[in-house]
């Protein structure tokens, strides 16, 4: 007999050889054995029956019984996935093969998550039709999303994050302290890392005022390298969580390339290893595409994953980051391929609503608008611009 504290109690019964007429009463024999065992004849049970017949025609019954005690399912460790499947088959015989498979999947999902409370409530539900429909929709949606192109997935990630951040700002402002602390002994750099905690925030990234170089130093040379850098007057910051890693704070009037030229010998002999530099804009201006892309990927990956090296299971994230970085390169520092409203230059991809809003503001002030340099109204040709109802004084002059 199995441990009585388990959700499924396994029992084995073997009767003596009985007259053949007893084959019609095997269920009575089973219930009698359950009763004398104290297992409870009224509980849901899964029974495997084997009938043995001897040479004289007498029969013997072998029962392998699994009795289910739902009240014992207080923690998921008291059940196995197979026990849940058997319980569903015993208690839900009316379900079709498809619905039963989906319902088993839902139960296994709660079991794998360790959510015994919801699992027990699901198993006790008298009707599960709506739950099965919901699970089918979830599986379909997930399968549909898996076939999105990378661009579509990037768009979904961005818009979902924007919508959620708007809801959080409006309804549920987050006042909790940030949970991600990287251990750097530089408060400014820590704040910079925390400001880039999602793909969407990387897209909206602004040029940071401070510049840093992150280096990994060989353990055997750690003390001597740190001492040499300090003797050179470099401003260093160390990490309390990761040994043999340090930050060099770059002077405002310099760039990371100047520092790396000084460290060229150490880099070539692999005494130090460059993890990333934060002044990626310099390499865009210097037209170093390869280093710009690789360095940007390393830095953003560290911001999102807190890892200095790429991992193969993050291929999707790396591809999204590569898409963002490449777009910034080809658009000369901007992810968007259009400029802001106050700029003198416009791109055809500029939103028409911004131009219309500019016209409305100009109408309120009765000012003259330079079409070519300010509005580019050719791109909104054919649209009716509403600048006011029955108010003749409100006019815009285009030149």
Curated annotation (Swiss-Prot):
UniProt keyword annotations, A-Z: Host nucleus, Transcription, Transcription regulation
Keyword Transcription regulation: yes
InterPro entries (UniProt xref): Baculo_p47 (IPR007799)
GO biological process, one term: regulation of viral transcription
Keyword RNA-binding: no
Record GO cellular component, one term: host cell nucleus
Location(s), subcellular: Host nucleus
Described function: It is involved in regulating viral transcription at late times postinfection.
Family statement drawn from the similarity comment of this UniProt entry: Belongs to the baculoviridae p47 family.
Protein's UniProt name: Viral transcription regulator p47
Organism: Orgyia pseudotsugata multicapsid polyhedrosis virus (OpMNPV)
């Amino acid at each position: 007999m199995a441990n009585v504290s388990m959700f499924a109690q396994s029992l084995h019964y073997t009767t003596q050889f009985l007259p053949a007429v007893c084959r019609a009463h095997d269920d009575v024999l089973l219930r009698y054995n359950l009763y004398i065992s104290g297992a409870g004849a009224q509980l849901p049970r899964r029974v495997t029956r084997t009938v043995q017949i001897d040479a004289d025609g007498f029969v013997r019954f072998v029962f392998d019984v699994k009795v289910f005690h739902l009240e014992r399912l207080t923690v998921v460790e008291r059940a196995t996935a197979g026990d849940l499947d058997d319980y569903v088959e015993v208690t839900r015989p009316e379900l079709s093969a498809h619905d039963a498979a989906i319902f088993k999947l839902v139960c296994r999902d709660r079991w794998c998550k360790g959510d015994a409370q919801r699992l027990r409530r699901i198993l006790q539900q008298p009707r599960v039709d709506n739950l099965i429909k919901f699970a089918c929709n979830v599986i379909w949606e997930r399968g549909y999303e898996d076939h999105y192109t990378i661009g579509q997935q990037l768009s979904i990630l961005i818009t979902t994050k924007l919508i959620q951040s708007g809801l959080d700002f409006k309804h549920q402002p987050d006042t909790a302290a940030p949970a991600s602390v990287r251990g750097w002994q530089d408060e400014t750099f820590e704040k910079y890392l925390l400001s880039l905690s999602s793909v969407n925030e990387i897209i909206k990234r602004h040029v940071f005022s401070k510049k840093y170089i992150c280096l990994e130093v060989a353990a055997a040379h750690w003390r001597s390298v740190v001492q040499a850098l300090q003797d050179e007057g470099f401003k260093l910051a160390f990490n309390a969580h990761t040994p043999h890693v340090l930050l060099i704070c770059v002077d405002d009037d310099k760039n990371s390339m100047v520092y790396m030229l000084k460290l060229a010998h150490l880099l070539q002999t692999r005494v130090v290893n460059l993890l990333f530099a934060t002044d990626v804009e310099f390499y865009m201006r210097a037209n170093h595409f390869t280093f710009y892309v690789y360095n940007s990927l390393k830095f953003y990956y560290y911001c999102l994953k807190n890892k200095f090296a790429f991992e193969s299971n993050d291929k999707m994230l790396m591809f999204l980051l590569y898409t963002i970085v490449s777009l910034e390169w080809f658009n000369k520092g901007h992810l968007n391929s259009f400029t802001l409203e106050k700029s003198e230059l416009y791109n055809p991809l500029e939103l028409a609503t911004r131009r219309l809003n500019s016209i409305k503001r100009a109408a309120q002030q009765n000012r003259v608008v330079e079409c070519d340099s300010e509005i580019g109204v050719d791109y909104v040709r054919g649209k009716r611009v509403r600048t006011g109802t029955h108010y003749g004084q409100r006019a815009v002059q285009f030149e």
